[in-house]
Amino acid sequence: MALPSAGEDVVRETKTPWWKGAQGEWYVVVQAVLMLLVLVGPRTLPGGPEWSLPYVPQRQMVGAILVAAGGAFFLAGLRRLGSALTPLPYPKEGASLVQTGPYSLVRHPLYSGGLFASFGCALMVSGWLTFVYVAALFVLLDIKSRQEERWLSQKFPEYAAYQRRVRKLVPFVY
């Protein structure tokens, strides 16, 4: 195997098996598990506290609005990303840096949309364990986005200016 020349994609060139996670595969697996838990996971632990929030129609409405808004933001991000879309955090070969549409509000609108929708689900089901899943998902996506941003910074010199200008996950906040 020849050594890659300057500018070549070293990770893809080495043909690392997917299960070693060289392109962030394990982030995607854990993310899928956490999102599945948010949707259909247990709401409390066996023998644990039976805590759940009392039914409040306003909380249900806020949850539904967050699910709809998060889903719409996610879909807008998918659409804007277009052919650069990949399930992995490693940037797709030949992709360009997208900074318009939802990407002008946050650097990771797919993650943001998923988080807002997940928090909305937690509000609607009111089980304490669902809030734990959402918190774990937030931590995972924050860590995943840091790795993704290292790769994006290597691929796109203009990414540093974009980072200074646009928040990571929550518009105008974080």
Residue ranges and their predicted role:
Residues 95-105, 110-111:
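Solvent-exposed interhelical
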Residues 1-99, 116-174:
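Membrane-anchoring alpha-helices and their flanking helix-loop junctions
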